[in-house]
C-alpha cells in the first residue's frame, strides 16, 4: 500500500512534459480526504508521518478525532528514523491508549500493527 497524497497537480497534462517546457513551478491543490470521507463499517486506521516531535502526538490525536478513526499509526522522522529507511518505529494511538513499538524492520512493524488492530 501507499499513502494517498495530500496534494495533487492543479493542472495535469496528458503525456510527458519535456524539461524545456516545464517552467519554474508546479501548482498543487489539496486532494480529497479519502479517509475522512470513508463511510464503511470497518476499522479505520490512519497513518501519520511527522517531523515535529514536540507536536506529533497532539497532531495524531487530532487526526484520530477529526477523521473518526479507530487508531492512528504515528511515525516521527528523526535521527533514528529516516524517510526511505528499512527500519521504523511507530506509536499506535487509540482513543484510550498509546503503544510504542521498538525500532525494527518495517515488515515486523506491519505484523505488530496487524496484531494491535485486531484488539481495537
Model-derived regions, located:
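Glycine-rich phosphate/dinucleotide-binding loop and adjoining beta-alpha-beta core of small-molecule
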Residues: 1-81, 91
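Small-residue (G/A/S/T)-rich helix-start motifs and N-terminal tracts that mark the onset
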Residues: 76-120
Amino acid at each position: 500500500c501507499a499513502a494517498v497524497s495530500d496534494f495533487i497537480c492543479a493542472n495535469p497534462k496528458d503525456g510527458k512534459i519535456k524539461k524545456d517546457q516545464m517552467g519554474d513551478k508546479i501548482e498543487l491543490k489539496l486532494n480529497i480526504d479519502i479517509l475522512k470521507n470513508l463511510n464503511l463499517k470497518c476499522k479505520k486506521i490512519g497513518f501519520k508521518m511527522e517531523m515535529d516531535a514536540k507536536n506529533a502526538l497532539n497532531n495524531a490525536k487530532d487526526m484520530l478525532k477529526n477523521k473518526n478513526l479507530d487508531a492512528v499509526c504515528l511515525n516521527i522522522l528523526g535521527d533514528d528514523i529516516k524517510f526511505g529507511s528499512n527500519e521504523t518505529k511507530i506509536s499506535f494511538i487509540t482513543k484510550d491508549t498509546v503503544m510504542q513499538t521498538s525500532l525494527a524492520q518495517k515488515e515486523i512493524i506491519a505484523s505488530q500493527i496487524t496484531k494491535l488492530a485486531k484488539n481495537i
